[in-house]
């Protein structure tokens, strides 16, 4: 998950994964789930800005979809899919069935 602690929707998704039993199980059983705290507002000259730019390039610029954005990598670190989170939303939160469908479609078993 690429986003940041400045992003309400990023925090909502992290909370959703933690509290929704089915989603939590799907994530923990099939993925190494990492949070990338990306801050597009940081100023040039900050050492973390260059590192963040390099990471976003390596991940095929997922920030173009907004935040949060989900990047699925294979076991070698190659980008398989970038998911815009808006397709998983419902109201002021996230939809369990849409999220489970997304996760199921990108499990290691599904992509082999």
Question: Would you name each region that the model predicts?
Answer:
Residues 3-6:
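Short pre-active-site segment immediately N-terminal to redox-active cysteine/selenocysteine motifs
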Residues 8-10, 43-45, 80-82:
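Extracytoplasmic/secreted cell-surface and envelope-processing proteins
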Residues 11-26:
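Typically the conserved alpha-helix immediately C-terminal to a functionally engaged Cys/Sec
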Residues 15, 41-43, 59-61:
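Chalcogenol-based redox active-site neighborhoods
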Residues 19, 52-57:
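N-terminal post-signal-peptidase region of extra-cytosolic proteins
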Residues 58, 64-111:
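Non-catalytic, surface beta->alpha helical segment in thiol-disulfide oxidoreductase systems
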